[in-house]
Amino acid sequence: MQTQVLFEHPLNEKMRTWLRIEFLIQQLTVNLPIVDHAGALHFFRNVSELLDVFERGEVRTELLKELDRQQRKLQTWIGVPGVDQSRIEALIQQLKAAGSVLISAPRIGQFLREDRLIALVRQRLSIPGGCCSFDLPTLHIWLHLPQAQRDSQVETWIASLNPLTQALTMVLDLIRQSAPFRKQTSLNGFYQDNGGDADLLRLNLSLDSQLYPQISGHKSRFAIRFMPLDTENGQVPERLDFELACC
């Protein structure tokens, strides 16, 4: 059985931001529990990047708009024969609940911004080697606290993002499920099509080909060029089959 590699590419700025936030939140939990300096730096670096992303746009506003848009889309299925009405109504209620929690939550990331340890580490992350024990004695002593005490603090930090995480997960799940994968074929390593107001491209490609896509475009039109991983000896077949979903 062939191994398929999934590539996702945003077709607008809001989706680009959402995917970056999703990625960074996932990275926060990869190396938990924090048991050493390397794990701590991985965690705090991702927290810092997450706060940087929050400061660049109206994340809450865009998510609330999308939660409302998804509710309106689901409401068009109410009363349609053959559609699981209880499932539709449950999703609408979940979207409403996520929106209510998000709109009443404090400023996104504010709890993390105000934490003294996070602020101290953020100041040193841009300096090469700037998180040594003599630069950050606060972090050094924190790493020697009882594991349970560190775990509790990390859980509190991550929990402060729950209103955002819950809303973002629902929105991205619905967008990803909004379009099926369809077989497409590129000619001489190139494929282009209309986006149909899509927010996100999802592309399944066989690992056997050892190719990756370079995608450009926006919601109304996009182009994909397939490139060999081995730039010197790799080849792109004249015809290449892949699966594509415009979500």
From Swiss-Prot:
Gene3D superfamilies in UniProt: YacF-like, YacF-like domains
Alphabetized Pfam families for the sequence: ZapD
GO molecular function: identical protein binding; protein homodimerization activity
Knockout-associated phenotype: Mutants are viable, with no discernible division phenotypes.
Compartmental location: Cytoplasm
Function according to Swiss-Prot or TrEMBL: Cell division factor that enhances FtsZ-ring assembly. Directly interacts with FtsZ and promotes bundling of FtsZ protofilaments, with a reduction in FtsZ GTPase activity.
Biological process according to GO: division septum assembly; FtsZ-dependent cytokinesis
Protein name per the record: Cell division protein ZapD
Location (main, coarse): cytoplasm
Assembly information from the UniProt record: Mostly homodimer in solution. Interacts with the C-terminal tail of FtsZ.
Gene Ontology cellular-component terms listed: cell division site; cytosol
UniProt superkingdom: Bacteria
Protein family according to the UniProt entry: Belongs to the ZapD family.
NCBIfam families named in the record: PRK05287.1-1, PRK05287.1-3
UniProt KW keywords: Cell cycle, Cell division, Cytoplasm, Septation
